[in-house]
Regions:
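Catalytic domains of carbohydrate-active enzymes that cleave complex glycans
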Residues: 1-194
Length: 194
């Protein structure tokens, strides 16, 4: 149980860190995507519809309550990770933790499949998750202002230190520091011990 908690929390933290890093760049911004979509509407009703359609396109990929190719248009965008994918993973890990606490197993073998993956409402958990996902699509005003935030170089340096140290716990024999090339502006891994 302790290992499950440790590794699931690390994974969730990685998603949050990814969102923080991506938020430094407007081209990776779900917030910008939503703001631009809303700008196409003239009335509040039209703006909400544009936001709903823009959200649906990159999440459930459909307008109905039982999409067949959900997650088809997955995007690793700031705002979408933090607001959509991270909460989904939190819900999944919470459900698994409940099974661990109760001493019951969780099986996905035999669940209804669509295109090689669990169907949108394959079991009670996925049904509840689907309801949350549909609710997310129907929520308006999701865009964070400003759409970009933070200094990407400072964040990269901080995350490199964090994840290099962490990677050594997982890959003790294969991780080596990267050595600056001659021009000191690019980096290459020469496979040498430093």
């Amino acid at each position: 149980r302790e290992a499950f908690t440790l590794h699931s929390e690390r994974f969730l933290g990685m998603l949050a860190d990814m969102d923080t890093l991506l938020r430094t760049r407007s081209e990776y911004s779900f917030d910008r995507w939503l703001t631009e979509a809303r700008s196409w509407g003239e009335t509040e009703e039209e703006k909400n519809q544009m936001e709903r359609d823009a959200t649906s396109l990159v999440t459930i990929w459909g307008a109905d309550g039982d999409p067949r190719i959900f997650d088809y248009s997955w995007r690793e965008w700031a705002g979408l990770i933090n607001g959509y994918y991270l909460p989904r993973w939190q819900k999944f890990y919470t459900m698994l933790q409940q099974h661990l606490d109760e001493g019951t197993s969780y099986e996905e073998a035999g669940l209804p499949q669509i295109y090689g993956r669990e169907a949108f409402r394959a079991n009670d958990f996925y049904h509840a998750l689907a309801e949350w996902e549909l609710s997310y699509v129907d929520t308006y005003g999701k865009a964070r202002i400003p759409a970009t935030e933070g200094d990407e170089i400072d964040i990269v340096k901080r995350l490199f230190k964090k994840y290099f140290k962490l990677s050594q716990e997982y890959y003790t024999d294969s991780i080596k520091l990267i050595k600056p090339s001659r021009d000191e502006r690019t980096y290459e891994n020469l496979g040498e011990d430093l």
